[in-house]
Amino acid sequence: MTAGLSTRRLRFVLLLAPVVALAQLPPPPPPLQPLPPPPVPPGNPLTPAKVNLGKALFWDEQLSSSRTVACGTCHRAETGGSDPRSVSGLADATAPGPDGMLGTADDITGSPGVVLTDAGGAYDEAAVFGLGVQVTTRHAPSFINAAYAPNLFWDGRARTTFLDPVSGDTVLFAGGALENQCTAPPVSSVEMAHEGRAWTDAAARIAAVQPLALAAFIPAPLQGWIGTRRYPQLFAEAFGSSDVTPARIALAIAAYERTQFSNEAKIDSMIAGTTTLTPQQQAGQGLFVGSGCAGCHAGSLFSDNAFHYIGVRPTADDPGRFAVTGDPADLGAMKTPSLRNVGLRSSYFHDGRFKTLEEVVAFYNRGGDFNAPNKPPVIRPLGLNPVQQANLVVFLREVLTDPRVARREAPFDRPSLYSEDVMVPTIEGGGSAGSGGITPKPIALEPPLTGNPAFTVGLHGALGGAHAVLVIDAAEPPSTGPAPASASFARVDVILLGAGAGQGYGSTVLAIPNDPALVGTRLHGRWYADDPAAEGGVSSSQAFSFVVFGPRGDGLMSVPPAARSTPRALQLSPGRPTPFAASTLIAYELYTAASVRLVVYDAQGRSVRTLVNGATQMPGSYSVTWDGRDGGGRPVSAGVYWYRLEGAGGGQTVRTVKLD
């Protein structure tokens, strides 16, 4: 319901407002037309091979320097094409606004990316985030139906002409916004890249790795097409030669994205005349048109693909379209998102400030929150009562959602990601404090995949400038120093950077041997740092553990070896982190399609919050963030909680602890 129109269109929309100067009923809207497939530029025709290649690349975390982020990490169908991790109020998804400080009104809900890393894989300290995962400064828009837009990103900086990211030669004269858009994240040191990464580095990585080596539950048609081939062979089928180039990567990903359009929502059945809306849905649709929403969220795409300032934040916070055009009329203006599948999304607007459609409708009902000369009159208090607001939400949530998108059904099926899987290293307990009473913390995020030449493990919160030792062993290293003199897997000495109590940080880059015999081996690690203020002169971090896995486990890598012969329908994992203060990520896997319920209970067995309620989900890995609140949005007290997953005739329960 973004707004901001030319004078002529604005006058037309104002005629549709609930209160009109001429005291006449608004004219009926023009009939909606069926949504056709998106346009395809002649220079990048769709072929099955190119689409399959693009699908593999889109979901391959190996495209990132850290091997932890794919395009699909931030763009998933089940959350309407946006990022399920991006939830307002979650610390791990919060970036500072223009004031540069966290915890203030201009904070942004973005997408977690990567730890700031140098070209050798060592971690650097980033402003605000330190050695934590950095967060983007805008909320990730949906990739579903993005192919209809002539310009992409919230500010439209991905334009229609696509230039080779290396040579600068024109590849597509028009229609190349998708190709342009997908060239940015793989070289962003916040989203996917190490500092100074060139596109040639990313292409070289892809040329050398096994396709989707980190993925599980690869859709059968895609896995059958890939077979045992490597990327150069896949590029040869898609493009006629085996060259893996940056431009070809972009062309393939864009080809796949052009197949990701949704046109089987209830609104499409209504357009086709095969179904009718309920009275409440009809009332919501009438309000959608009569209140002016349809002016910008126009046509069967429910977007005009234009840019408008609507008062989400002051124009000084984010220049929006102005940064591209230099036109003062574009200050703070953002691209109108399509409202298809909007009910599945976890955050709304370019800054992700709202969690629910109810909040979004309330925002429009009060006429936005800020004003500027370029804010159009159509953004004004609407005077909708609670029933009307609820009807509008029902229309948006129920009528515009394509069930294939919600259920991850083809063409919206996908592999599961390493970052969703239980194979991500787990931070455990223990540790001993050093100077300032601070216990050092380990950083273990990257995949312990056999053959991974750059498995980086970091430390922060120790004494700056101190000597530190990383120990990784088959048994958990002791929780207090000194560091063991030897280890079965790795023992590495590091001089920490930084100065002062709790300011020391460092990392080391290890190689996971390409040895199949290691698959299934659980290893445990801990850091030790010299510190005269620590007991015995040595502080120690919490322990961490991980299981070495092999490529393309198809879900088997997520099941303990002893259980692999035991049929099961689902697997529930401990929350990350546990214990937790602000939020915990609950991951689970389904080995068969099932109607799923995931419920949080307190220590007395009382239901606290239903996180998933009867949704039918396809086989794959899923994750849900619990923000430590009950069903009414109130923070729960510290203590023990249980969450239970039920589906396909089975169930599992896991314990977690909420801290103050």
Feature-to-residue mapping (PLM):
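Post-cleavage N-terminal segment of exported redox proteins
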Residues: 2-57, 80, 189, 193, ...
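C-terminal tail/sorting-segment detector
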Residues: 610, 625, 634-660
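Terminal processing/anchoring signals of secreted or surface-associated proteins
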Residues: 470, 527, 556-563, 575-578, ...
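Extracellular low-complexity, Gly/Ser/Thr-rich intrinsically disordered linkers
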Residues: 341-413, 460-465, 507-538
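Short glycine/threonine-rich turn/loop motifs
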Residues: 24-171, 265-373, 407-423
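Aromatic/hydrophobic beta-strand junction motif of beta-rich domains
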Residues: 455-462, 584-590, 626
